[in-house]
Regions:
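Double-stranded beta-helix
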Residues: 38-41, 151-232, 236-237, 333-352
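Short histidine-centered beta-strand/loop micro-motifs
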Residues: 84-88, 106-111, 128, 135-137, ...
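Conserved metal-binding segment of the jelly-roll/cupin
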Residues: 138-158, 169, 313, 320-340
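Conserved short histidine dyad/triad with adjacent acidic residue
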Residues: 78-82, 96-111, 280-297
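Cysteine-centered motifs
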Residues: 9-10, 18-19
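Short hydrophobic targeting helices and cationic amphipathic motifs
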Residues: 5-6, 26
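A short, N-terminal "cap"/entry segment at the start of jelly-roll beta-barrel domains
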Residues: 28-91, 194-285
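A short beta-strand-loop-beta hairpin characteristic of the jelly-roll/cupin
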Residues: 110-140, 150, 294-322
Length: 352
């Protein structure tokens, strides 16, 4: 239809207002299409993500093999070089997710940047220290922000598959340091790390020329890592069943819980966890509410824990179902709406 209408109009000389109008309309349509494509690249529908089933060196071991790893924003720390990344653009933080069957999870390891776990479903045992002797149990709605320079691990302690979302600090969260026995046990299954921290399956691949197997760290190095007792680590834990103590009114129908950092958009709040992670973590709570004209000056993502949240970003509209994520362009106009029968929760992470 456009071509049939366009041709005769353009036969007039000089060029008619009709042609100019059509050209302008086509330009606007093209811009809208390009904007739609750009925003689609910022939208991560959880059911469209491709997980890695062998994301780390201990992935063939009992207690670790029945799990999936998702890279949603940024590469995270997955050792699988083929891990699918949905939103690759840098945000100064990473977002991932882990699902695991009962009695499965990660081995003891340490990170050089912040690692914040948001429990979506299930019952999880978190344990820490080089021997993994200290532990706590967390449930859906709970959050734990693990300090750097400490060994930590987690295991699904429930009766069915569970899900955790994980926020990691920095564009490059660095490498993982494993306790020696993890690497030693993994090697017996054929899995190893090379000295560039790339993952190799020795049962099907040879060590590339110029590379060698990464050796476990020495006992003297282990002593340099921090140890925490449960009462020391509790200040880094938010229990969802205590949320009413920390709720702030964002407007008449949306409450906010500030977990990390002290800012949501341009408003300041006291955080539940006082820790320098490099990002703000806020939770919006509502069943029927809306908020308009938000504007974020730093890289920001939103991801739904529960409920269908309608998000309008300038002229782009989407619905975030549970587990879906959207990356917000800097200085865009953002409107949020929720219409459910029970309280729902929307997570928001913004660079500090």
């Amino acid at each position: 239809m456009i071509s049939n209408f366009f041709t005769p109009c353009c036969s007039f000389k000089p060029v008619s207002n009709c042609c100019i109008g059509i050209y302008n309309n086509l330009s606007r349509v093209n811009i809208i299409i390009q904007l739609e494509k750009h925003m689609e690249n910022r939208l991560a529908k959880f059911n469209e993500l491709v997980p890695s089933t062998l994301p780390f060196v201990e992935g063939k071991l009992e207690g670790h093999k029945d799990r999936k790893n998702y890279s949603i924003v940024g590469p995270g720390v997955a050792e699988d070089g083929k891990q699918f990344i949905k939103i690759a653009m840098p945000h100064s933080f990473n977002l991932g997710a882990v699902s695991a069957l009962p009695k499965n999870g990660s081995g003891l390891h340490s990170h050089t940047t912040a690692e914040v776990f948001i429990i979506y479903s299930g019952r999880w045992r978190f344990y820490w220290g080089a021997e993994g002797k200290d532990e706590t149990i967390l449930n859906a709605g709970d959050i734990i922000s693990m300090p750097t320079n400490m060994f930590r691990a987690f295991e699904n302690a429930g009766d069915e598959e569970g899900l955790i979302f994980v926020v990691l600090g920095g564009d490059d969260p660095g490498i993982i340091t494993w306790v020696p026995r993890v690497l030693e046990k993994a090697k017996k299954t054929g899995m190893a790390l090379l000295n560039d921290n790339s993952l190799i399956d020795l049962s099907v691949n040879k060590i590339p020329e110029g590379k060698k197997i990464l050796e476990p760290i020495a006992q003297e190095e282990i002593k340099k890592f921090d140890n925490y007792k449960l009462d020391q680590l509790e200040k880094f834990i938010f229990k969802g069943n205590e949320k009413s103590k920390y709720e702030n009114k964002l407007n008449d129908n949306i409450n906010l819980i500030q977990i990390l950092g002290n800012k949501f958009e341009k408003k300041e709040f006291s955080p539940v966890i006082n820790q320098d992670t490099g990002f703000n973590l806020s939770i919006l709570k509502s069943n029927k509410g809306h908020i308009t004209n938000l504007k974020f000056e730093k890289p920001t993502i939103m991801f739904s824990r529960t409920g269908k949240w309608e998000i309008m970003i300038d002229n782009f509209q989407c619905v975030l179902n549970s587990k879906d994520t959207i990356s917000i362009p800097i200085n865009s106009n953002v409107n949020i709406k929720i219409d459910e029968n029970e309280d729902c929760y929307l997570n928001c992470v913004t660079q500090i």
